[in-house]
Regions:
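Glycine-aromatic micro-motifs
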Residues: 1-191
Length: 191
């Protein structure tokens, strides 16, 4: 497979934050430095995307402090996402960094492409979902497994601000719409 689309729904909605997974570096407000991808070029395309489901915040981010955004594709609602067109290699390196692994190994995407959902491990962001298709290429995202056991937790201010910036940047949402959307996600999270 040459290309695919990655659907971002958390801080990766903000393009400059997302591209640190490719080029390497430390996003503004984050505590973690990312090694980057084998192919550091920016995405060949990106666009707004709507997904069925909802986001919620849980666990504790070592990068941002506070809860992390997770995607529940089975919940009612609509998720504002951003689709980035990447090579399969770039996606593998992105996923590795999200899974707190070293980049450099290609993921076997056949299981998720065949079954629409596949867990590559027990941790957060190790469950991949095939959420659709764009221009005859698969759209993939990752989240925690359904039974992850992470406690609901409000997001840290830097993380929340990065998500809000990405929502405005990609979807051109008003501040009021961004606040209402993130408040709804925090309410689901019990925060």
């Amino acid at each position: 497979m040459a290309d695919l689309w990655y659907a971002a729904y958390g801080s990766n909605l903000a393009r400059d934050r997302f591209t640190t997974y490719l080029s390497g570096g430390r996003p503004v407000g984050a505590a973690r430095h990312y090694p980057g991808a084998r192919d550091p070029r920016p995405p060949s395309d990106d666009r707004p995307l709507l997904l069925p489901g909802r986001i919620y915040f849980a666990g504790r981010s070592l990068t941002w402090g506070g809860g992390m955004a997770f995607y529940d594709p089975d919940a009612p609602g609509t998720v504002y996402a951003r689709a980035y067109r990447l090579s399969a290699e770039q996606f593998s390196d992105l996923a590795a960094q999200e899974m707190r692994r070293d980049p450099g190994t290609d993921l076997d995407l056949a299981p998720v492409l065949a079954g629409r959902r596949h867990s590559y491990g027990p941790g957060r962001y190790e469950t991949l979902h095939l959420v659709g298709e764009l221009e005859q290429h698969p759209v993939l995202t990752f989240t925690a497994p359904v039974d992850h056991g992470l406690a609901p937790n409000p997001p840290g201010p830097g993380y929340l601000a990065t998500i809000a910036r990405g929502l405005r940047e990609c979807h051109r949402l008003s501040d009021d719409t961004v606040v209402a959307y993130l408040d709804a996600a925090r309410a689901v999270s019990g925060s």
